[in-house]
Structure formats: C-alpha cells, structure tokens
Regions:
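Transmembrane alpha-helix termini and helix-breaking/packing motifs in multi-pass membrane transporters
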Residues: 81-103, 181, 185-186, 296-316
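C-terminal membrane-cytosol helix-exit motif in multi-pass small-molecule transporters
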Residues: 87, 113-136, 325-333
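Short amphipathic helix-loop junctions that connect adjacent transmembrane helices
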Residues: 177-193
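Structural signature of the two symmetry-related core transmembrane helices
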Residues: 4-19, 223-238
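Helix-to-loop junctions at the C-terminal end of transmembrane segments
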Residues: 1-2, 91, 208-221, 305-306
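Juxtamembrane intracellular "pre-TM" segments in multi-pass secondary transporters
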Residues: 128-168, 185-189
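Hydrophobic core of transmembrane alpha-helices in multi-pass small-molecule transporters
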Residues: 15-17, 24-47, 247-261
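Cytoplasmic helix-loop-helix junction between adjacent transmembrane helices
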Residues: 32-76
Length: 343
C-alpha cells in the first residue's frame, strides 16, 4: 500500500543519514545514498514524490489538481529553503566554535537521519483514503500482462519518462550542491552566504509555483511548462557570464523565480493524462527516469569542476540541453490535453 511504502522510504532515509554520519567507505556511501533517497540537489529523488502525487490526484477533482500541486510545490520549496539556510548557518557556527568541518557536516546528516524517523511517524498517520482501493475514480485492476502497472497509459508514460530523463540529466550538471560549490570556487562565498543565497532562491521558486497554477488556467499546462522553463534556461546559461558575486546572485534568483513554475504543471499534467488506476505506476516510472538521468550527469560535472578552467561549462551544457527538452516536450504533447482543458 501507499502508506507502507512512504513509511519504508522514511526508514531508508534515516538509515542513509546514519551511514553518512558514521562511515567513510565510498562504496557503502554510494549504496546508502542510492537507496536512502539522499539528494545532492535538496529536491525529492526517492519514492515519496510519485506516491504523494498519485495520492493527491486520487483525492482531488481535476479542476483543483494544478492549484493543489502548486501549494504542494510551494511547501516543498520553502522547506528546502529553510533547510539550506539552517545547514549553512549551523555548519559555519559549528566550525567557528572550533569544530572540524567534517564533524560539522556529520552533525547535519545526523539531523537528516532524525528527520527521517519523524517523517516515518507522520506517514503512519496518513488516511486510508489515499490507497488505490478507495475513492470514486477507482478503475479495474491492471492485468498481469501490463508493464509494471501500466496499461493504456504505457506509450504516454514512456515518452514522458524519456523527456523527463533528459531534463534531469541536464539539471544534474548544476544541482544546488554543485551550484553552491561553483559560487565558492568562483567568488569564495562562505557557507553562511551560500545558505542565504539558496534560501532566497528556494523561496522564490516556491512562490512562483502559485503563479504557475494561475497561468496554467489561462494558457494550459504544456504552454505554461514551456514559456516559463525556456527563459529560465537562458538565465542559467548567463550565470557564469556574470563578473561579480552580486550580479551572479541576481541572475540566479531571477532564474529561480521562474524555473520551478513547470514543476506543479508537469506533475499535474502527468497525473492528468494517465489512467487514474495507473497514476502510482506512472509517477514511479517518471520518477525513476528523472532520478536515473540526474544520477549520470554529476559524474561528468564532477570532472569539469575538478578543472578550474572548466567550471563554467556545466552551466552551458545544462542550459542548452534544457532548451532542447522544452522544445521537444512542446511539439510532442501540445495536442494531448488534460481532461480539464478539453472542449
């Protein structure tokens, strides 16, 4: 069931935090990070997202779906912002109190493990109404011949998954941890400064999600995804062209003020164009595709960041690939409208 999967994911999250706190074995850390939903971007990469999206879509009417996803995105962005600010401030405070840098980072991942335990306790209180066998939109169970729970929606989900993998592959070059490292390498920004920068960035991103739902009502989900995501990717390319820290921060904040407007619309669109009984499977497929895409590019980005002359290249690669993604998703899905947009 969905509730049990959410609790299991929270337990894995806690175990991964403990692993990062108490071992330095690289192989073990890679395994723990993979199964324990540790994200270098600060955004969701584990099982929670797909299950939560399917559960929300299961409970709310189509006309309210995008607005609910916007609030869902806002809540997540604000939590990410507070986490970035807290981690930066606490880490620097611990280091100034004579604690070694590695020990200060260990304190943060221990807190991560504790929050995983708290999250698991919260998930045990989730209503049984989120399960597939509840609610008016229940469909017949998919046959065993279907692709891991996908029947009629298979072609749409596979195509979306491929495009989402491309977008995440591009984003993996400039996840927030890499972007923070770039600000450190390029301008010597301290942890406290970096925490403040990404606190503001995530607040901007969260607020923009609410605007996305309003825009989607006017021009549709696919158009909203593209007209907001495309200029944000041009701003991404412009960040390394800025000569000073303040200018680079301004461009970064401008980008974040529109870059996440495609998130609630993308989530809403995915849940809208698949069969209700296949939403969990669709969320899982697209989630795995995004995670897989995002897992590959940091290897390449790490190589580029290891060479001072190449630290700007990840921004150019990411921005260009994301522009390609925007064009592909528009021309591939502009004619497939969600139910609430059909005449």
């Amino acid at each position: 069931g969905r509730r049990r999967m959410l609790v299991a994911g929270a337990v894995l999250m806690a175990l991964a935090g403990l692993a990062f706190a108490f071992t330095s074995n690289l192989l073990f850390l890679v395994i723990a990070g993979t199964i324990g939903v540790i994200s270098p971007s600060g955004n969701e990469v584990g099982p929670f997202l797909s299950i939560e999206q399917a559960s929300l879509s299961h409970l709310i009417p189509p006309g309210s779906r995008t607005e609910v996803f916007a609030w869902y995105t806002l809540t997540g962005s604000l939590a990410t912002a507070l986490g970035a600010l807290f981690a930066g401030v606490v880490t620097q405070a611990l280091q100034r109190s004579s604690m070694a840098p590695v020990a200060s980072y260990r304190a943060i991942v221990l807190l991560y493990a504790f929050l995983g335990i708290v999250l698991g306790m919260v998930f045990t209180q989730v209503s049984a109404l989120v399960e597939v066998n509840h609610g008016p939109d229940q469909l017949q169970q998919t046959s065993t011949g279907n692709l891991l729970g996908l029947g009629k929606s298979r072609n749409v989900v596979l195509k979306l998954s491929g495009l989402f993998a491309l977008d995440s592959f591009a984003g993996g070059f400039v996840v927030q941890s890499f972007a923070a490292y770039w600000f450190y390498l390029r301008f010597g920004a301290e942890p406290k400064t970096l925490g403040a920068i990404f606190f503001a960035a995530n607040v901007f991103a969260g607020i923009s999600a609410l605007l996305a739902s309003r825009l989607a009502i006017r021009i549709g989900l696919i158009r909203t995804m593209v007209v907001t995501h495309l200029p944000s990717n041009l701003l991404l390319i412009a960040i390394p062209l800025m000569p000073t820290l303040p200018l680079a921060v301004v461009v970064l904040l401008l980008r974040f003020s529109i870059s996440q407007m495609d998130v609630p619309t993308r989530q809403s669109y995915t849940m809208a164009v698949v069969e209700p009984g296949e939403r969990s499977a669709a969320g899982g497929f697209t989630g795995v595709a995004r995670t897989t895409g995002a897992a590959i590019s940091p290897l390449l980005a790490g190589f580029l960041f290891a060479h001072p002359a190449l630290i700007n290249i990840p921004f150019y690669i990411a921005g260009t690939l994301k522009v390609v993604y925007d064009l592909l998703i528009y021309f591939s899905f502009r004619k497939l409208r969600p139910p609430e947009e059909r005449p």
